[in-house]
Design a protein with these regions (language model features):
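Conserved glycine-rich cofactor-binding loop
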Residues: 18-20
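Substrate-binding pocket helix/loop in short-chain dehydrogenase/reductase
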Residues: 100-103, 107-112, 216
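Short, small/polar-rich loop/turn modules that mediate ligand/substrate recognition or access, typified
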Residues: 185, 190, 246-248
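Residue(s) in the substrate-gating loop at a strand-loop-helix junction
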Residues: 153
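Short C-terminal tail/terminal secondary-structure segment
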Residues: 2-4, 96, 100, 236, ...
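Alpha-helical segment proximal to the catalytic Tyr-Lys
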Residues: 131, 181-183, 244
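Active-site helix of classical SDR
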Residues: 126, 169, 177
Length: 262
C-alpha cells in the first residue's frame, strides 16, 4: 500500500458486503478505486452488485460464512488467486438475535449463533488474513502493510437488555480490535474499529417507527438516521492508509449519539 498514490492496485475484502452497511462500504471502496472481494452467504451475488462495483475486472463475489472458521484459509487463497494480494480486510458481517429476549429468557442457541458470526468468525478471519498480509512484501516508504477495519456497533458500550448476546459480541469486537492492533503494529498492519449508531438498513427496518420518534426526542445531536454510505466513508478513510501513525482507534459513526450529555 502506497500512501497518497492511486489505489487501483489495492484489494479489499468486505464480509457481508452485498447488502446494508456492507454494500455501502463496498460501493465507497470501489468508488475510491479499490478492487473489492465481496463475501456473503448467498450462492451468488445479488443481481447488479458486481456491475455496481466496477464489473468483474474490479469486483468479485465469494460465497462464505464467517462463522465457518475451517473455511477461512480457503477463502483467503481464493481471493489471492483472483486478485494477487489482500491489502484491506473489513470485518462487517454480523447478525442480531432472531428474536429479542430479556436476559432471563435468552437461549444458549441464540448466544452461540450471534457470538459465532459477530465475534469468533471475524477474530479468526483476521488471523488468516493477517498471516497472508505478512507473507506479502512490506510497503515502501513507511506506508501501512495492510489495514484491518472491524465494524462494531454503539451496542459495544450501550446496554440493551433484550439482546444481551448482541451487545456482548460487539464489546468483544472492540476488544479484539485493540488486541490485534497491539499485536500487528510492529508488522506494519493497522487495525481500527468503526462503531456505527442507528443506520438505515434492512436490519433496522423493524424499529424504524421507534427510532423516528427517538430522533424527534433528541436521542442524537444529529437528528437523523445514518446511512450505509456514512459508514462507507469512514472505512474508506481508514483503508486509504492516511493515518499511518494511528492504530487501535475507534471511529464513531453515530451522529454524536455516543456523547455524554446533560
Amino acid at each position: 500500500m502506497n500512501q497518497g498514490s492511486p489505489v487501483t492496485d489495492r484489494v479489499a475484502i468486505i464480509t457481508g458486503g452485498s447488502r446494508g452497511i456492507g454494500l455501502g462500504i463496498s460501493r465507497t471502496l470501489a468508488e475510491q478505486g479499490f478492487r473489492v472481494a465481496v463475501v456473503a452467504t448467498r450462492p451468488e451475488a445479488p443481481e447488479g452488485v458486481i456491475d455496481a462495483l466496477g464489473g468483474p475486472e474490479r469486483a468479485a463475489y465469494f460465497q462464505g460464512r464467517v462463522d465457518d472458521v475451517d473455511s477461512h484459509a480457503g477463502l483467503v487463497a481464493e481471493v489471492v488467486e483472483r486478485f494477487g494480494s489482500i491489502d484491506v480486510l473489513v470485518n462487517n458481517a454480523g447478525v442480531a438475535p432472531e428474536e429479542r429476549r430479556d436476559l432471563l429468557e435468552a437461549t444458549p442457541e441464540s448466544y452461540d449463533r450471534v457470538m459465532g458470526i459477530n465475534l469468533r468468525g471475524p477474530y479468526f478471519l483476521t488471523q488468516a488474513v493477517a498471516r497472508q498480509m505478512l507473507r506479502q512484501d512490506a510497503a515502501a516508504g513507511g506506508a501501512p502493510r495492510g489495514v484491518i477495519v472491524n465494524v462494531s456497533s454503539i451496542s459495544a458500550t450501550t446496554v440493551s437488555t433484550n439482546r444481551g448476546e448482541y451487545c456482548l459480541s460487539k464489546a468483544g469486537v472492540s476488544m479484539a480490535t485493540r488486541l490485534w492492533a497491539a499485536r500487528l503494529a510492529a508488522e506494519g498492519i493497522l487495525v481500527y474499529e468503526v462503531r456505527p449508531g442507528v443506520i438505515a438498513t434492512d436490519m433496522t427496518a423493524g424499529v424504524k417507527d421507534r427510532y423516528d420518534a427517538l430522533f424527534g426526542q433528541g436521542i442524537s445531536p444529529m437528528p437523523r438516521w445514518g446511512q450505509p454510505s456514512d459508514v462507507g466513508g469512514a472505512v474508506a478513510a481508514l483503508a486509504s492508509g492516511a493515518m499511518p501513525y494511528s492504530t487501535g482507534d475507534v471511529i464513531h459513526v453515530d451522529g454524536g449519539m455516543h456523547l455524554p450529555r446533560l
